[in-house]
């Protein structure tokens, strides 16, 4: 285990390195918003036409969907960590970008059932019973997702101060993994039908989304060069 003294030295060296890079004019940061949520990135000059960019993006979105079977609470979480290289082939603000992204994007749903129809049969709940709820989870197939894209804005070419950045690209998250489960059903025979319906719906959704392996990325932001 790393000692507190060793950790303190590592933090101090990292801080001194960042200060040195910042003083050399080879460090810039940007904040932005887009389909990956709110983002914060830092760019470091590697070569005259190549920047390394590291960042974090996060946003949580919630909504309620209404259906005849019940109301569904939907919670979507955008959570990614970027490790990217920006290449400027024409010595201007246009750049090609590639890299790897830790992809923690996910969707969680909870449907509180107030009724159910399955294969033409409408099930009624005896007094004091309940269909419970159906929990759903949507997770990406690749926790480490490749990214390719283009963009405009070189945060390290202008003088100290503010600038603009933008990105358009594709995040290859792989085949999504969708799971559904029923919980808390006490409605007797209706529970058996519910389990079958949930299993069929899970298979249908996984089949429907099997080919949707990319996530579109579009971002715009403001940068600051130190």
Regions from the PLM with identified roles:
Residues 1-25, 211, 226:
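Cleavable N-terminal export/targeting peptides
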Residues 23-27, 38, 48-52, 92-94, ...:
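Outer-envelope beta-barrel architecture signal
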Residues 26-67, 71-88:
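Long, hydrophobic N-terminal alpha-helical segment
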Residues 33-37, 56-62, 100-106, 154, ...:
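Transmembrane beta-strands of outer-membrane beta-barrel pores
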Residues 40-44, 83-87, 98-100, 148-154, ...:
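Residues on the lipid-exposed face of transmembrane beta-strands in outer-membrane beta-barrel proteins
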Residues 46-50, 89-91, 154-158, 226:
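Outer-membrane beta-barrel strand-turn architecture
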Residues 56-83, 105-145, 174-217:
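Extracellular/periplasm-exposed beta-strand and loop segments of Gram-negative cell-envelope proteins
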Residues 94-99, 112-114:
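A eukaryotic "domain-to-IDR transition" signal
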